[in-house]
């Protein structure tokens, strides 16, 4: 798996666009998130349709065309240094094919942040733009608004990524050992749903795969993992990092399933790595070569997630 292009780190005064590719955004949470960004001396701008709600499908932040237009306009605006998603939910799969990927590639690299439903965009940005992205807190997310650890880890990644090149999670080994690879992954359900789509990568070979999910029954997690196994998508994966399983069954019931489905891969697996739908979620860059030490619960990036400007 190849290393991807790193966008430039942010500096004080950088303009960041907030977009909503998925679900509708509560205005009060958006405003609170904007206040956090302003407190970092950033200049946040809100895309035109962020507060929209679809007339028929109220789980969408407006129409597919409007959500895609907001993301593309923000990405192609030369004054914008970073694009932050407001929240997840559902909707990226509906709008991803409406994006003009050639125009977005021509606009050059910039920082992209999000998680959950945004997993589909992490995959598309990797396959279509060849770009490092950040799996991290979103601008209108409760954890981002209220949790100092989530805020500070994202802030350090954006402004001083060399200070968080070693990500220490406190995680423990499900399968001990060390592994090297290029980071990738996100929400398990979205990775399974992405198979066979125009922006899906052929597999996780040579990768350090990050997996998490929210609100799923254990049998569904079994189904998603089994689909990835049967399709060959997990063939040759270097190691696995397991994040949070919020609103799923108690972990003592889920853990045997994860061991059953992933233990046969013969690679290190670390659990409770502290990313995803959890309190104080860590920011994990995707597309960066790294070493996983499952025994110590650390991920050491070969180089900072974002490069120096110029």
Swiss-Prot record:
InterPro entries hit by this protein: Carboxypeptidase_A_C_sf, Class_I_gatase-like, LdcA_N, Peptidase_S66_N, Peptidase_S66C, S66_fam
GO biological process: proteolysis
Active site: 116 (nucleophile), 212 (charge relay system), 277 (charge relay system)
Domain of life, per lineage: Bacteria
Keywords: Carboxypeptidase, Hydrolase, Protease, Serine protease
GO cellular component, one term: cytosol
Entry EC no(s): 3.4.16.-
GO molecular function: carboxypeptidase activity; serine-type peptidase activity
Coiled-coil boundaries: none
Similarity-based family: Belongs to the peptidase S66 family.
Protein name: Putative carboxypeptidase SCO6489
Species per Swiss-Prot/TrEMBL record: Streptomyces coelicolor (strain ATCC BAA-471 / A3(2) / M145)
């Amino acid at each position: 798996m190849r290393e991807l292009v790193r966008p430039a780190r942010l500096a004080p005064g950088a303009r960041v666009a907030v977009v909503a590719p998925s679900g509708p955004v509560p205005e009060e949470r958006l405003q609170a998130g904007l206040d956090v960004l302003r407190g970092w001396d950033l200049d946040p701008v809100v895309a035109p349709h962020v507060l929209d709600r679809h007339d028929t499908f109220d789980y969408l932040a407006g129409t597919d065309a409007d959500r895609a237009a907001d993301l593309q306009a923000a990405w192609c605006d030369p004054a914008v240094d970073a694009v932050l998603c407001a929240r997840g939910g559902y909707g990226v799969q509906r709008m991803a094919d409406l994006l003009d990927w050639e125009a977005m590639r021509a606009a050059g690299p910039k920082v992209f942040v999000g998680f959950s439903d945004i997993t589909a965009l992490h995959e598309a940005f990797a396959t279509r733009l060849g770009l490092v992205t950040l799996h991290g807190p979103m601008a209108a997310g409760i954890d981002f608004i209220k949790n100092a650890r989530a805020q500070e880890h994202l802030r350090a990644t954006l402004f001083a990524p060399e200070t968080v090149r070693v990500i220490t999670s406190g995680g423990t080994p499900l399968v001990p050992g060390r592994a090297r690879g290029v980071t990738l992954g996100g929400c398990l359900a979205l990775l399974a749903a992405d198979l066979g789509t125009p922006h899906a990568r052929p597999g996780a070979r040579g990768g350090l795969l990050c997996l998490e999910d929210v609100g799923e029954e254990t049998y569904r997690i079994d189904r998603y993992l089994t689909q990835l196994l049967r399709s060959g998508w997990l063939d040759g994966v270097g190691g696995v990092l397991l994040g949070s399983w919020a609103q799923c069954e108690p972990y003592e019931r889920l853990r045997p399933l994860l061991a059953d489905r992933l233990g046969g891969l013969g690679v290190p697996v670390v659990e409770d790595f502290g990313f995803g739908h959890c309190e104080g979620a860590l920011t994990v860059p995707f597309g960066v070569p790294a070493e996983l030490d499952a025994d110590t619960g650390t991920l050491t990036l070969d180089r900072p997630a974002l490069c120096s400007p110029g």
